[in-house]
Amino acid sequence: MSLRLVNLGLPKSGTTTLGHALKLAGLRVADYRIRPHQTGGRDAREGAFVADLLYRGLYGSGDPLAHLDGFDALSETSRLRGRSVWPQTDFALIEALRARHPGLRFVATRRDAFAMAQSMLRWSDMVARLTRMPVPGLPAGYGETAAQRMRWIEGHYAFLAAVFGDDPRYLELDVAATDAPLRLGAHLGIDLPWWGTANANPEST
């Protein structure tokens, strides 16, 4: 099965919930990086970051998905460990995906901007990395306050809305909405047997 869905949402937007729901629906999901159990130890991609594979394809053959065969969905694409790589913010990469794969569906998971900003604060050293590394729309030195992170978050989803317009292949999905699983299932043409909260912050209420 060729890849069917790419999530363009930011970290802490519900990417793990999305990935878990898709896995339980029978899809093979790459979330952030390629895990050993997904390759059987016989694949050079083992341990590779999804972000790096997307750019390897884009700047190799022109197809961002060239090195992601065998997967049905990408639930988180950015990288902020060691390097700062953000495919979901890259117009050229998104346009290459749309042109090369006309049947590909896109989703942008999101939550309330303040909730996302606070979740980033509580998750490991994410805010320290955000402020230290250059991130598209959030230069190094910014992102320490919730207000700055919220401005960046809102700007990202406004960017995606401007890029896709009324393209039916794109769905902005509030993962906390009661109809989220129904909307996502309809978008993909599948039934989702589970929807909930995965990878929750231990401090969250």
Predicted regions and their residues:
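PAPS-dependent sulfotransferase catalytic domain
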Residues: 23, 58-65, 84-181, 186, 190
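Amphipathic alpha-helical segments that form well-ordered structural scaffolds
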Residues: 17, 21, 96, 152-163, ...
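The conserved 3'-phosphoadenosine-5'-phosphosulfate
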Residues: 33-43, 107-121, 158-205
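Short, well-ordered alpha-helix to beta-strand connector turns
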Residues: 70-71, 101, 167
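PAPS-dependent sulfotransferase catalytic core
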Residues: 1-71, 77, 195-196, 205
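Short, flexible loop segments at the rims of nucleotide/cofactor-binding pockets, characterized by
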Residues: 49-57, 82-86, 149
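N-terminal substrate-binding region of glycoside hydrolase catalytic domains
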Residues: 75-83
